[in-house]
Design a protein with these regions (language model features):
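Generic alpha-helical segment signature
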Residues: 10-13, 240, 603
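Mobile "lid/hinge" segments at catalytic clefts and subdomain interfaces of large enzymes
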Residues: 74-332, 336, 341-345, 349, ...
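Glycine-/charge-enriched secondary-structure boundary and capping motifs
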Residues: 1-10, 14-16, 20-33, 171-173, ...
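Short histidine-centered beta-strand/loop micro-motifs
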Residues: 188-191, 414, 660-662
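N-terminal amphipathic, basic-rich helices that act as targeting or association modules
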Residues: 2-78
């Protein structure tokens, strides 16, 4: 008898249970209930987000595969396709930071090579609580070590990403992992069974008890006690995954298999039921044949285990021996555990008894889709209303404090733990506006960027959703890349709270507008709800991963000032906006609004101008203006170039000086160029109706920033670099 306590343990409501009984035609047994629990979880079933996600633009001439498969696929020409996706591993990384982050990397890698692609790069978007608190530092160290430990051992470069710090992430750190791979477009594989009578093979590592109900755990709030959920976190083996990659690609090459699915969230349950549902078939499985590393496992445990480094393959019977020979060579299990059958049902036997008999359509396609109550977000009040924001007494000190804020400070302490050069495709080191990856044998290159500003999104969710897309595309423009597609990881609190659903709906609206403006399709992604501990939700955090193409890598724009005497030009308009800025937060201890406004038409023009100038070879450097505004962008341009080069800049009167220096107005890029190319750039700007102003030059060994001739900031590059470079390492040294 299934009572309310059992339903609560499985995160199912009484109404959902009634629907299950109706679909199955009887009351399910406990193992069958476990199957519905994981497949109808928020993590797998998207029951609170599906009605909104389907509004996203997913079509385009380059789209080979959009949402619905293990990863999105875009045609990039020359017979190649790029396969990419982003996923979250937030809840596991809070409970067990090292393994949570490591298996997040492992899972996204499998999503990519399941499609037949070889992973060529990983990026990550990380959010932690303030690093001056011991627990937050411990989580951060564990997460970074987990990413490095798995990625480095597997042999995939971690080429960039973003790291933010905010008190809201102290109880809910976010670990979003993006992966990109390459495949010949005529050798893409899908999760399908294809034909009745085909063999179902279990390949890879053995099944244990780790990760059981991991998907369900990721679909619920945390309370005061999380230690008991530690067994829900999977344990990864990157060396086993490397063997699995090579064995899978070798079996795919001659077409020995007809379909393949990663055993990720919900494990064997998800892979069997989804493959059957997509192909309109059924599957029969004998659990006695499943390789197990622990004794006495029950059907419930075997079906729901999320042990890592496992795949489900479907092959024609006459090909099974060939597949097994390949996996034996790589010292991996490849065992026939069942077959494809007619009837559209998942039938599972254990010790000779039938323990599961369920319609796959009910498991996969008939999960309820909720239009949850929502409250439209209220616009944030203007910064300074009620309590005016005073100007700093000393702008140079404010500038140095901003450079040392953990969100802005140098992240080399993190990046240096990652191998970013393995595979030798990495063209730009981590820290550039976007990652750039060579396409060997071609002049073309791929670029990728991850972006999302959670504070801006809290203050204005719709603009925050649009701005995440816009900034990711802007970062691509800064390296000379044209955006071609986007994947998303949407991190929110409890969707049962109307204010959270209101934020989510508004973010989706903003993303839709921006994706349409840039004509880029959404190829898939992930929603992570219930980032909520003891009733407190994180700031809404959409993270957008945009992929782009550089037609000639020799014209890619590298970060950093190059030569004394070069002219510094600001593309775009600075407005009187300090709301939601890192300056307001770090210097004044406030998080007022409103967020900076975004005009997508202006944004497109600025990016198009930057791309055109890059293609013409006019730019020596380009850097987008985001956290910290113009002052930080100029400083970073000094740091990424020759360390002995400063800049002298004089800005117009008319705006608050702190808004000029530190405001985060959208749609701006700081570029440097040779004096001989200035007139051509300004002419292009006039023709394209883009505001562009020569604001200074690369000069000396100091960063000197003035307004209408009045000096505001005068700091040596050496002093600024020290503040920026040492901020995060010093936190760990001081508190070691």
């Amino acid at each position: 008898m299934i009572d309310d306590r059992i339903l609560k343990d499985h995160n199912l409501t009484r109404d959902e249970f009634k629907l299950i009984v109706k679909l199955v035609g009887r009351e399910p047994n406990l193992t069958e209930l476990g199957i519905f629990s994981v497949m109808w979880s928020e993590h797998c079933g998207y029951k609170s987000s599906r009605v909104h996600l389907k509004k996203l633009p997913t079509k385009g001439p380059a789209v080979i595969q959009g949402p619905g498969e293990n990863a999105g696929v875009l045609d990039i020409g020359d017979g190649l396709a790029v396969v990419f996706k982003i996923e979250s591993h937030n809840h596991p990384s809070f409970i067990e930071p090292y393994q949570g982050a490591a298996t997040g990397v492992g899972g996204i890698l499998r999503d990519i090579f399941t499609m037949g692609a070889r992973p060529i790069a990983v990026m990550d978007s990380l959010r932690f609580g303030p690093p001056d608190q011991p627990k937050n530092r411990s989580i951060m160290e564990g997460v970074v070590s987990g990413i490095a430990g798995y990625g480095n051992s597997f042999g995939v470069p971690t080429v960039g990403g973003e790291v933010y710090f905010d008190a809201g992430y102290a109880q809910n750190p976010l670990v979003n992992v993006f992966c990109l791979g390459l495949v010949q477009k005529d050798k893409i594989f899908y999760a399908k069974t294809e034909g009745v009578g085909n063999a179902v093979l279990y390949v890879g590592a053995k099944t244990g008890r780790d990760g059981i109900h991991g998907a369900t755990m990721a679909s619920a709030e945390f309370g005061k006690e999380t230690e008991h959920k530690r067994p829900n976190v999977q344990v990864g083996d990157p060396f086993k995954e490397k063997l699995l990659l090579e064995a899978c690609l070798e079996a795919m090459e001659p077409g020995l298999i007809v379909g393949i699915q990663d055993m990720g969230a919900a494990g064997l349950t998800c892979s069997t039921s989804e493959m059957a549902a997509k192909s309109g078939t059924g599957i029969e499985v004998d659990l006695d044949l499943v390789p197990q590393r622990e004794a006495g496992m029950t059907p419930y445990e075997i079906m729901l285990s999320e042990s890592q480094e496992r795949m489900l393959m479907v092959a024609r019977p006459e090909r099974v021996a060939d597949v097994q020979a390949i996996f034996a060579k790589w010292d991996l299990d490849a065992v026939v555990i069942g077959k494809v059958v007619e009837g559209g049902r998942l039938k599972v036997r254990f010790h000779g008894d039938e323990v599961i008999d369920l319609p796959v359509d009910a498991i996969v396609n008939l999960c309820p889709a909720y239009k949850r109550p929502s409250v439209k977000p209220k616009p944030a009040k203007a910064a300074g209303k009620g309590a005016p924001v005073s100007l700093p007494d000393n702008f140079s000190k404010a500038f140095l404090k901003l450079l040392a804020s953990p969100t802005i400070a140098d992240k080399e302490w993190i990046f240096r733990q990652y191998d970013h050069m393995v595979q030798t495709n990495t063209a730009f080191l981590p820290g550039a506006d976007a990652a750039v990856l060579r396409l060997k044998g071609s002049r073309r290159a791929l670029a990728a960027s991850l972006d999302g500003n959670s504070l801006h999104t809290r203050l204005d969710p719709k603009t925050g959703g649009a701005a995440a897309v816009a900034e990711a595309c802007r970062n691509l423009a800064c390296v000379g890349a044209r955006p071609i597609g986007v994947t998303n990881c949407l991190n929110f609190g409890n969707p049962e709270k109307p204010e959270v659903m209101g934020q989510f709906e508004a973010v989706i609206e903003g993303m839709i507008e921006a994706c349409k403006a840039f004509t880029i399709p959404v190829t898939g992604g992930n929603v992570s709800f219930y980032n909520d501990t003891e009733g407190t939700s994180i700031n809404p955090t959409p993270v957008l991963g945009v992929v782009g193409i550089i037609e000639d890598i020799d014209k890619a724009v590298r970060p950093g000032f190059k030569a004394a005497g070069d002219v510094v030009v600001l593309l775009g308009e600075t407005k009187d906006e300090i709301g939601g800025s890192e300056y307001l937060k770090s210097v004044h201890g406030r998080e007022d609004g409103p967020a900076p406004r975004l005009d997508l038409a202006v944004e497109k023009k600025v990016q198009k101008l930057c791309l055109e100038a890059a293609g013409l070879g006019l730019l020596q450097s380009a850097h987008d203006l985001s956290e910290g505004g113009l002052a930080v962008a100029l400083a970073e341009s000094c740091f990424h170039g020759r360390k002995d080069l400063g800049c002298v800049v004089d800005l117009e009167a008319g705006l608050r000086p702190d808004a000029l220096l530190f405001g985060e107005s959208q749609s701006r890029i700081a570029v440097s160029l040779r004096p001989a190319d200035l007139d051509r750039l300004l002419e292009l700007a006039r023709e394209r109706k883009v505001r562009a102003a020569a604001i200074g030059k690369v000069y000396g060994e100091s960063i000197v920033l003035s307004q209408a001739g009045k000096k505001l900031v005068d700091v040596t590059v050496r002093e600024a670099f020290k503040a920026w470079k040492n901020a995060i390492p010093d936190l760990f040294k001081i508190h070691a």
